[in-house]
């Protein structure tokens, strides 16, 4: 006698239950990987009074803003506010290499590659944090909270960040983060960015999940309200506060000039600021913003536009103080050294698609649902003199964090799930 066959609805019900349980599990994991946005400031760490107290501060460097010669000591205490889509991953690699070379102490996130972004930074988010702990370098993604950061580094720490033309940043952020911003899902056109910019108020909800990625992202990363009225006096007050807190604001569009100013500020060597462009996106089949759409994107991100204009002007004042001719010489030297390292280190001499990367250790983190981020293949025969530097210059952020001892269990779990589901 044949065993009784299961009814179709029973199999369907079991499938639905299993699917619901699995989906719930994924949502739980994702809630750890991407925490909900809180409108208010994170509560200040109770041990705020127990600020960083190093046994002895490093000698103060001579800040040579006027380009004059003078002895200085390399600066080793640095806070880098890593903003989104601004070539900040390339800067991160520079800081990782310097810190590793000099055995400096990093303040790493606990379990992830960011400090629970987009919530505000708090000292309790630092891996192995103890009251009074002191660090040399803080450089992972965070939503900036000055008082919390200030208490983790010596008083002579240098604060830096990097900005980008707000329209271009918005374009990059829209394409990169769009799949995890639900408000973009209702856009039907093949060119969703153009459709959005035709009437952004129709689609945008400031309280929507991950909505901060689509408006005034620089202002948001700096810890300010990205929905302020652009005519509010608070906007200029915040911009001036950034100017007081940060010793140098770099510009992505003038990256080499920015690195020359950074090298001078920190009293570093040329080798310390060599770089390869990391986390670069493959060219999109969608055309770049036209003149009209560029204007719309600029207007939509007006807070960031005010911020960028202010620091674009101050940047060129710093260049003038440094000396135009001197800047041209040092930029040329940096580019020559970068080109030399490219021929020594990179197989084929250029970045490649993810599918063409041969070493898993060189695979960059990819946005959800696509493999649009380029990476590199390391040459197989590199002389002993350059082998270590080449590998460090080409190592992606996640792998470098693990090499430096960061505990990335949440990030690794999320990667496992994504690989399993082929997201």
UniProtKB/Swiss-Prot annotation:
The biological process GO terms on file are: galactosylceramide biosynthetic process; galactosylceramide metabolic process; glycerolipid metabolic process; glycosphingolipid biosynthetic process; myelination; protein N-linked glycosylation; spermatogenesis; sphingolipid metabolic process
Please give the superkingdom of this protein's source. Answer: Eukaryota
Q: Which residues are glycosylated?
A: 66, 312
Q: InterPro entries, per this entry?
A: Gal-3-0_sulfotransfrase (IPR009729), P-loop_NTPase (IPR027417)
> Which keywords fit this entry according to its UniProt record?
Glycoprotein, Golgi apparatus, Lipid metabolism, Membrane, Signal-anchor, Sphingolipid metabolism, Transferase, Transmembrane, Transmembrane helix
Q: Does the keyword Transmembrane helix apply?
A: yes
Q: What is this enzyme's EC? A: 2.8.2.11
Give the residue spans that cross the bilayer.
15-35
A Gene Ontology molecular function term of the record: sulfotransferase activity
| An example Gene Ontology CC term for this record | plasma membrane
Q: Which reaction does it catalyse?
A: a beta-D-galactosyl-(1<->1')-N-acylsphing-4-enine + 3'-phosphoadenylyl sulfate = an N-acyl-1-beta-D-(3-O-sulfo)-galactosyl-sphing-4-enine + adenosine 3',5'-bisphosphate + H(+); a 1-O-alkyl-2-acyl-3-O-(beta-D-galactosyl)-sn-glycerol + 3'-phosphoadenylyl sulfate = a 1-O-alkyl-2-acyl-3-(beta-D-3-sulfogalactosyl)-sn-glycerol + adenosine 3',5'-bisphosphate + H(+); a beta-D-Gal-(1<->1')-ceramide + 3'-phosphoadenylyl sulfate = 1-(3-O-sulfo-beta-D-galactosyl)-ceramide + adenosine 3',5'-bisphosphate + H(+); a 1,2-diacyl-3-O-(beta-D-galactosyl)-sn-glycerol + 3'-phosphoadenylyl sulfate = 1,2-diacyl-3-(3-O-sulfo-beta-D-galactosyl)-sn-glycerol + adenosine 3',5'-bisphosphate + H(+)
Cross-referenced SUPFAM superfamilies: P-loop containing nucleoside triphosphate hydrolases
Keyword hit for Transferase: yes
Q: Where in the cell is it found?
A: Golgi apparatus membrane
Q: What Gene3D superfamilies does the database record attribute to this sequence?
A: P-loop containing nucleotide triphosphate hydrolases (3.40.50.300)
Q: Which residues lie on this side of the membrane: Cytoplasmic?
A: 1-14
Q: Under what name is this protein listed?
A: Galactosylceramide sulfotransferase
